[in-house]
């Protein structure tokens, strides 16, 4: 009954409160879950454990965080890693030489680099497919084991119908893996839509403060959970206790941060659309976005990420060099507003023909909108754009 009551709680509450049993007086009544900064644990007698033996295997602080993330994604298990790429790297251990994966054509550059330069070397084959518009079933082979997508994608904000894709993957008995970093569990839960594994860069919205690195794998399948647990203890890729504490603290404000950032993003996207030096603004919250209706159906919000294309490369470069409060930096999902240049940053290692195919030109900028007062953000953008125009 207690578990049913907990699961019925709204996500804002679940961000702050795990089950009462997990916040019990056993921790001296601490409201903030303690940091167990210990590498190893004493045994009371031979053959008996406290439940923890060595922090590479498990640590109470990490376990608490993992239970929180699992609850937010409605999964049976979540595992915390030292970074998002560490999580994806371990996930690839599910596959063996000769296996084939279908991956979205528009992905984070780090994922593409891993697949092209590490996984392929290990004998895994990939097909790059525009999963939001192509018939994925046409690319499935006898040795296909999984489909890997982001939705929305990084950086072009393409949207894939998760439920429709899950029907295809289940029909062919292959895995559906969804990177949910851009929307976070607050706005979207892929497992509820049929995905088997959810990936997060916890560095982004879950942590939310640009002060630590983390990654997560979440699943609702016991067999996958058991495999991941074996791999994380064997490889030692688990997240350290203090970093777990920082991510846990960040999650407590996930709801208010996501709401505020989205509000700001909508206002900024509208303003950008009106600028004569802006050729295109890509934001899934616009009705003209091809994925708008899908987003309304499968998500609870549109997020705070947007991409815009300037009419000239020089305009893009000048904007990056003239912003002050808004920072020209990689990453996303923090309280600060950041502008990124995918061409030389997040997607620098992506082959040129793929960048061109995805529309990532030297005029494209990606913005992660933060939670500052939107008036201040707009005032800075107005000043910067005026300088860029030479006004």
Report residues per predicted region.
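N-terminal "arm"/small-domain region of PLP-dependent enzymes with the aminotransferase-like
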Residues: 2-59, 65-68
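A common structural junction motif
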Residues: 235-236, 323-333, 384-391
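PLP-dependent enzyme catalytic core of the Aspartate aminotransferase-like
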Residues: 2, 116, 125-127, 257, ...
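Glycine-rich beta-alpha junction loops
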Residues: 20-22, 37-43, 182, 204, ...
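Conserved PLP-enzyme active-site core in the AAT-like
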Residues: 5-7, 20-24, 78-277, 282, ...
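Conserved C-terminal alpha-helix-loop-beta "cap" of PLP-dependent enzymes
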Residues: 280-365, 369
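Conserved N-terminal alpha-helix of the aminotransferase class I/II PLP-enzyme fold
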Residues: 40-89, 93-94, 110-117
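Short loop segments at secondary-structure junctions
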Residues: 40-41, 219-223, 251, 310-314
């Amino acid at each position: 009954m207690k578990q049913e009551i907990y699961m019925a709680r709204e996500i804002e509450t679940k961000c702050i409160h795990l089950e009462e049993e997990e916040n019990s007086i056993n921790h001296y009544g601490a409201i903030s879950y303690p940091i167990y900064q210990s590498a190893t644990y004493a045994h009371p007698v031979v053959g008996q454990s406290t439940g923890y033996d060595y922090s590479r295997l498990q640590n109470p602080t990490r376990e608490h965080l993992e239970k929180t993330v699992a609850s937010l994604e409605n999964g049976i298990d979540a595992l915390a890693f030292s970074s998002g790429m560490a999580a994806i790297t371990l996930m690839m251990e599910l596959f063996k030489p000769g296996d084939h994966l279908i991956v979205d054509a528009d992905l984070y550059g780090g994922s593409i680099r891993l697949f092209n330069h590490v996984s392929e070397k290990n004998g895994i084959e990939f097909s790059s497919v525009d999963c939001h518009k192509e018939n994925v079933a046409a690319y499935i082979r006898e040795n296909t084991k999984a489909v890997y997508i982001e939705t929305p994608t990084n950086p072009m904000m393409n949207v894939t119908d998760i439920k429709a894709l899950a029907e295809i993957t289940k029909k062919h008995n292959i895995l559906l893996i969804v990177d949910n970093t851009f929307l976070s569990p607050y706005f979207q839960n892929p497992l509820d839509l049929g995905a088997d594994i959810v990936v997060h860069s916890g560095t982004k919205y879950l942590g939310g403060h640009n002060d630590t690195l983390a990654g997560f794998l979440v699943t609702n399948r016991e067999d996958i959970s058991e495999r991941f647990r074996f791999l994380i203890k064997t490889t030692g890729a688990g997240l350290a206790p203090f970093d777990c504490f920082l991510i846990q603290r960040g999650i407590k404000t996930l709801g208010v941060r996501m709401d505020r950032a989205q509000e700001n993003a909508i206002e900024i996207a509208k303003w950008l659309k009106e600028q004569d030096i802006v050729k295109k603004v890509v934001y899934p919250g616009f009705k003209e976005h091809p994925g708008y209706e899908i987003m309304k159906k499968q998500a609870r919000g549109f997020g705070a990420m947007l991409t815009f294309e300037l009419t000239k490369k020089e305009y893009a470069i000048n904007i990056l060099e003239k912003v002050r409060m808004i920072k020209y930096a990689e990453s996303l999902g923090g309280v600060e507003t950041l502008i990124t240049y995918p061409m030389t940053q997040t997607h620098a290692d992506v082959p040129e023909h793929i960048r061109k195919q995805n529309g990532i030109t030297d005029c494209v900028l990606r913005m992660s909108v933060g939670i500052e007062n939107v008036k201040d953000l707009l005032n800075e953008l107005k000043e910067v754009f005026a300088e860029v125009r030479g006004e």
